[in-house]
Amino acid sequence: MPISCDRLSTQRSSATLRKVYGSAFYLIAAYAPHDVRRDNLAYRIAHSNNETQKGKYFPQAEHLILRDQEELGLSHGQNLRDTYHRADVFVDSTTDDTLAQSVGRFIELIFGNSLRTPSRSEYAMFHARAAALRSAELGRQVGAAIVRTNGDIVAVGTNEVPRFGGGLYWCDDKPDMREFVQGRDSNDEHKRNLIADTLTRLKRAGWLQPEKGSLEGTELVNAAIAGESPMLSRQSLIRNVIEYGRAVHAEMAAIVDAARRGVSISECTMYVTAFPCHLCARHIVAAGIRRVVYIEPYPKSLAAELYLDSIKVEGGSKCDDQVVFEPFVGVAPRQYMQLFEESKRKDDEGNAILFDAAKANLRYRASERLYLEEEDFLLKTLSSALIEKTLPSGGKDA
């Protein structure tokens, strides 16, 4: 019998359920523009306090939205930012009608309606993801696809090191000069050099505490960035520097790919697996692209802050004088081949087999024996961990 969980707000939770139930587990992410989420949440808060004026609760609603995105300082806190993009489908919850339509279509797909075919948006994002898989970058894989309004794909790109003669390195190019061959991430290396240079200058000027003043370059850097509570955490601005990498970013690679072939991308839409950084955003604007659709957030990006005049994030209504950046809605690339692969579409006489919800079966069924074994193993592991955490003797006195 299907079981639903109405809220998963940490990546660990979704990863655990996916590990236990495999293909029988589907993570559904509901999207609505920020203003809609804020208004709905403020309305619920007001209603719970027997009030009708939701406006006074906007600040509280904004606080809860930010907390849910990433609850800093808590290892098991809310972290929708790292969970949302791992979904199997993204549904539009802006209104009851759009939500019902999105969820209804997804249910038909998982119950084997092979006459449901990909939308232009799903097709484009799948190509962006396919392009991403070409990358061997040490950080992460990102892909982009530039698409005309009719769905034609005019260019794709991935984040990879450029090679002489144009384009990016392929796996069989000789010599292969991608970053993993050199054994290091050039951006991380230069960030460490920046930190070392800054700390060394502070040391020479006598600005460091005595116990830190005796440390040298590498020791200073490690003291600043290592440990459970480093002075320079991953959220510090200096550790968010991104411009020293050797790889061409996926968005730039797609734009350059079109330029090399003389293909116009004016008025096109770019589908990208992650929100563009501020370096790519300016090229997107300059190239004449009108719309950007993304899946994964990218907190390091300053695009919205730096280009308020030319970029609108989660635009909602159509904008004639700004590039709209909006989240993807539809079947995620991770489920594209599974849910859109054909099953039997006609009978022996050549008649179309139409979808019958009353007789439909799930496309994929998990082995009950296997997931029961996984559940049992997980419960034993959790029980042991809880006993060890609560008893100083590690559970020996239990």
Indicate where each model-derived feature is located:
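Zinc-dependent deaminase catalytic domain
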Residues: 72-81, 94-398
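Small-molecule kinase domains that catalyze NTP-dependent phosphoryl transfer to phosphate-bearing small molecules
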Residues: 13, 43-103
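Short glycine-/polar-rich loops that comprise or flank the Walker A/P-loop
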Residues: 21-26, 86-88, 289
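A short acidic, amphipathic alpha-helical/loop segment
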Residues: 15-20, 280-283
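Short active-site oxyanion
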Residues: 2-3, 26, 267-269
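Conserved phosphate-donor/acceptor-positioning beta-strand/loop module used by diverse small-molecule
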Residues: 6-8, 17, 21-45
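N-terminal helicase ATP-binding lobe
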Residues: 1-5, 9, 13
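Terminal amphipathic helices with adjacent charged low-complexity linkers/tails
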Residues: 34, 38-39, 60, 65-66, ...
